[in-house]
Amino acid sequence: AAMAGIVFSINAFVGVWLVAMLSFAHVCARPPRAGAAETLKAVGLFALISAPTAVWILDTMTGDDARVAFSYIEYIRLYFPHHFLAEAALAHEIAKFLIMTYAAVVAALLLDNTRFWWSVLAACVLLVAAGVVLPYVVDARPVFNLHLLRVDGVVQFVAPLLIVIAAVRALAGVDKPFVEALGAVCLMALTSAQRDGGPILVALSITLIALARRGRASSLRLADLRVQRRLVALALLPAIALCVVLDLRMDRFDWLPALRYALMALVLIGALQVEARRLRMPAPPAATLCATLLALCLITVAARLDARSDTQARRETLRQPYTELVEWIRSSPLEGRFLIPLDDPFGSREFETFHLDARRPVWVDWKQGAAVMWDPSFHGLWAVRFEEVRALADDAARIAYARANAIDQVVLESTTCPPGSSQAYGNARYSVCVIQP
C-alpha cells in the first residue's frame, strides 16, 4: 500500500493501475492474515501518502482551465492514436502481447504462489480490455489520461520475471536432460521476446516444461525419447526456423540472433544425444537438421552483414541533409518562427525535434499536440494550425499560408523556393525560404 501511494505520487495513472492490480489480487488471492483491520490499514496508508497528489489532480481537472470543449477521441486520432486507441494497434504487436500473456500464465502455474500471479495477470488483462472499450464509450479526458492500453507494459515486465523463474527451475532441477534443454531454450528465446518470432519459442518451450513437470500422462510421454525427437523435429526446430524467417522479413537478422538460434538448436540436439547415450539408443537423426540449420544461419549472416552495414550507411546519408539544415539555421542570423514539414506519428519523425535542434520557434508541429493533455485550452490553437498546414497542397500554398499568417521563414522539402520568397539556404533535400514583403 505504501509503495502504491508513492508510485501514485510520482506517476498517478501508473498508481491507479497498481491499486487495481493489488485490489484484484487481494480479493482473488487473499493472504491468510489479511483481515478487515489489515485491509483498512493498507487503504488508509495509501490514502495518506497519495492525498496531496490526488487533491492537486482533482483541482486541475475541475478548474476553469480543465474544461474540454472538443472531442477528446478526435484529438487523440489527430495527435497520437497508437498510444491510446485499439484501432491503431498493429496485428503482430497484439499477437505478441497475447502470446507472452499466455506464457506468463503457464509460467505462474510452475510457481508456488500461482493464484496471486494469476490474479495480477488477470487484472492487467481486464485493464487492457477496459482501455480497448472505454475511449469509444466515454469521451472524457480522465479515460485517456489513464493510458489503460499501456498496461500491456506491466505484462511485458511481469511476464519475463515469471518465465525466467520457471525456466531456471527447469534448468537447475532434477528433470531429464530434455526438460533442462527446454529451460535453456526458453531463457534464450526470452532475449528475443521483442522480435516477432521470439514469443512463439517462449510459449512453446514453457508449455512443454509445464507439461513435463505438472502433467502426469504428459510427463510419461515427454520422457519417451521418440516423442522428444518428434517434438524437436516437428515443433521446436520449425519454430526456430520461423523466427529466422520473421527476422529476415523485418530486416532484423544479424550475427547475434543467428548465434542465439543456432545455440538453441544445438542445445536441443545435445539433450537428445545425452538422453540417447543414457538409454543406449542410436543418435537422433535430427542432428542433421541441426547442422543444416546452423549452416543456413551462418550463410545468411555472411550474406546479410554487408547489406546491414550498407543500410546503416544509407540511413546516415539520408539524415545528413537534415543535420546540415539545422546546423545552418542555428548559426544563421534568421529569427522568428519557422513553418516546417509536418511529421507523421506513423511514419517520418525527422522534424519532431527541429525547434530543439535549430533553436528556433516553429508555427506548429506534431509534437506540440502533447501539450493539450496538460492544457486543454491549447487545443484550439494547435489543432487549427495543424489541420490547416496538413491541408496545404504544395510549396506555393505553404508560402502563401506563411505570408497570410506573418510567418517569417518556411522550410520546404525542395531544392528551390516558389515565387514570393527568396532562398536563404538549400541543400540536396531542403530549402529555407524567406517570405518577401
Protein language model features and the residues they cover:
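Hydrophobic alpha-helical membrane segments of integral membrane proteins
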Residues: A2-M3, V16-A20
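Transmembrane catalytic cores of multi-pass membrane glycosyltransferases
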Residues: A12-L18, V27-P160, V164-A167, T191-A212, ...
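Membrane-water interface at transmembrane helix exits
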Residues: F24-A25, A29, I165-A172, L272, ...
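Transmembrane helical bundles and short interhelical boundary loops of multi-pass, membrane-embedded
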Residues: L127, V137, D152, F178-E350
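Short periplasmic/luminal acceptor-recognition loop of GT-C membrane glycosyltransferases, typified by
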Residues: A303-A307, R314-E387, I399-C417
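Short acidic, glycine/proline-enriched helix-loop-strand junctions
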Residues: C417-Q436
